[in-house]
Amino acid sequence: MNIAVSKPDLTIRLCGPRGFCAGVDRAIQIVVLALKSYGAPVYVRHEIVHNRYVVEGLEAKGAIFVEELDEIPAEHRAQPVVFSAHGVPKAVPEDADARNLFYLDATCPLVSKVHKQAMRHNRLGRHVVLIGHAGHPEVIGTMGQLPEGTVSLIETVEDVDVYEPADPDNLGYVTQTTLSVDDTAGVIARLQERFPNLTAPSADSICYATTNRQEVVKQAAPGCDLFIVVGAPNSSNSKRLVEVALRAGATKSVLVQRAAEIDWDDIGDIKTVGLSAGASAPEVIVNEIIEAFRDRYSAVVELAETVKETENFLVNRELRNIELTTADMAFVNGE
């Protein structure tokens, strides 16, 4: 006789907004449309977004990812190369021009806005203070918009305390778009305390999607026995969500790329799980994780939503006459 084993009850607090932002959506669409328009291969400099699932999905369609332009073989120089959503230093398109490469720039428009803010500070004679994480592609790209020696990178309040600029009365700051809103506010406050004449950018540099995802996690995390963020270990905004969940009161918070990474033996007795996804994490993985919990629990999904995002960024002019179908994006959005 078969005896049915009841599953333990579980509430999943599903955060909204979550996952792809308009800049990530646009960048992926650019690669997909370039493949439809020009055929494979399409080269992409650096990961188009920081997510292996997305990268592997595009590779399956015919994209080839490289770190430098000199990796593109001579016989493929006529094929397009796409610059990633994180932005690139000015030297990269200059190098592409010197090699007679046709390139499509998938830099997020909000990152491009930070570039313009930094260049405006520089044009007006201010030394630029960039708040961001050393080595991140976006930071490398922003610093690469300016002449060497005209920008200083600050990561923490402690960095501010030891910062000694040549002209403390002539500084302007910008920030990486994917930082912790609260941490960045602390760094800016200390900068303003030390340098009262510090000039702010004309608009907030941290992007709407970063802010929205952090705000809903703050609301959903209290009372969660476990909070799961879908994202890659090299995704800045995803890692910030893990930190935000812990600070907001989640007992435990973890970053996973796939459901297979969840350590079920380590979960313990849980009643409430929070679930969000970084701006470069596809919805198909969120659904995969929900199904993994439903296999083990009698799970009820509750939507924790703050705002509905309606932002949409146009793709490059060269690609706007190419039809983008639901099937083209099913590998990340689901059917």
From Swiss-Prot:
Its cofactor is [4Fe-4S] cluster. The active site is at 138 (proton donor). GO terms for biological process: dimethylallyl diphosphate biosynthetic process; isopentenyl diphosphate biosynthetic process, methylerythritol 4-phosphate pathway; terpenoid biosynthetic process. Isopentenyl diphosphate binds at residues 50, 86, 136, 235-237, 280. Keywords: 4Fe-4S, Iron, Iron-sulfur, Isoprene biosynthesis, Metal-binding, Oxidoreductase. (2E)-4-hydroxy-3-methylbut-2-enyl diphosphate binds at residues 50, 86, 136, 177, 235-237, 280. Its EC number is 1.17.7.4. Dimethylallyl diphosphate binds at residues 50, 86, 136, 235-237, 280. Pathway: Isoprenoid biosynthesis; dimethylallyl diphosphate biosynthesis; dimethylallyl diphosphate from (2E)-4-hydroxy-3-methylbutenyl diphosphate: step 1/1; Isoprenoid biosynthesis; isopentenyl diphosphate biosynthesis via DXP pathway; isopentenyl diphosphate from 1-deoxy-D-xylulose 5-phosphate: step 6/6. Gene3D superfamilies: 3.40.50.11270, 4-hydroxy-3-methylbut-2-enyl diphosphate reductase, catalytic domain. [4Fe-4S] cluster binds at residues 21, 108, 207. Binds 1 [4Fe-4S] cluster per subunit. It holds the Pfam family LYTB. One of its GO terms (molecular function) is metal ion binding. It catalyses: isopentenyl diphosphate + 2 oxidized [2Fe-2S]-[ferredoxin] + H2O = (2E)-4-hydroxy-3-methylbut-2-enyl diphosphate + 2 reduced [2Fe-2S]-[ferredoxin] + 2 H(+); dimethylallyl diphosphate + 2 oxidized [2Fe-2S]-[ferredoxin] + H2O = (2E)-4-hydroxy-3-methylbut-2-enyl diphosphate + 2 reduced [2Fe-2S]-[ferredoxin] + 2 H(+). InterPro entries: LytB/IspH (IPR003451). NCBIfam families: ispH_lytB (TIGR00216), PRK01045.1-4 (NF002190). Catalyzes the conversion of 1-hydroxy-2-methyl-2-(E)-butenyl 4-diphosphate (HMBPP) into a mixture of isopentenyl diphosphate (IPP) and dimethylallyl diphosphate (DMAPP). Acts in the terminal step of the DOXP/MEP pathway for isoprenoid precursor biosynthesis. Belongs to the IspH family. This is 4-hydroxy-3-methylbut-2-enyl diphosphate reductase. The lineage of its organism: Bacteria, Pseudomonadati, Pseudomonadota, Alphaproteobacteria, Hyphomicrobiales.
